[in-house]
Amino acid sequence: MIPERLEFSGIKQTKFDCVFSMGLLYHQRNPQEHLQNLKDFLKSDGQMIIETIIAPDSYGMALEPVDRYASMPNVHLVHTDLGCKSMFEDLKLDLVSESDSVPTSHLEQRKTKWMPFKSFESALNQDNQSLTIEGYPAPSRKFYLLEPKF
């Protein structure tokens, strides 16, 4: 496992059986490039596992937050399921399997003695927990298992 940014890893010629992108897609200024870079690290029979937050399909391809999303300043696009699948198709990635969409829980991201700052709970509208404090739909997570079409 190499838990570091691909562009800084110095392993450009290495091919892997499996690559993971866990909670990174929505932080990318160019998510297609991120996925293409991951694909480039796969063996021809390799697999890619993507975990990301998704927006409701009513947003079309993606929700593009102004300034912040759920208190996070570095969220550029929150794709819908349709938007993710369209990107996968454009990049010639076969969708092998997918999870259901599951709302993010305050139990996953909470204050602890090691992280005593604001938590996920503080990023939600206190009067309506289905919305972020910015008024966007609260995050839901989804996993995708992909294989390259070479």
For the regions a protein language model found, what residue spans apply to each?
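Hydrophobic/aromatic anchor residues within beta-strands of the central parallel beta-sheet
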Residues: M1-P3, M48
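A short acidic, Gly/Pro-enriched loop at the edge of an enzyme's catalytic core
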Residues: E7-V19
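A short SAM/SAH-binding and catalytic strip from SAM-dependent methyltransferases
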Residues: F16-P31
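A short glycine-rich, Lys/Arg-flanked "PGG" loop and its adjoining helix->strand segment in the class I
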Residues: Q32-Q47
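Short, glycine-/aromatic-enriched active-site segment of Class I SAM-dependent methyltransferases
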Residues: I53-V75
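Short alpha-helix
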Residues: V75-E98
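Conserved catalytic loop of SAM-dependent methyltransferase domains
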Residues: D94-A123
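C-terminal lobe and adjacent flexible extensions of AdoMet/dcAdoMet transferase-like proteins
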Residues: N128-F150
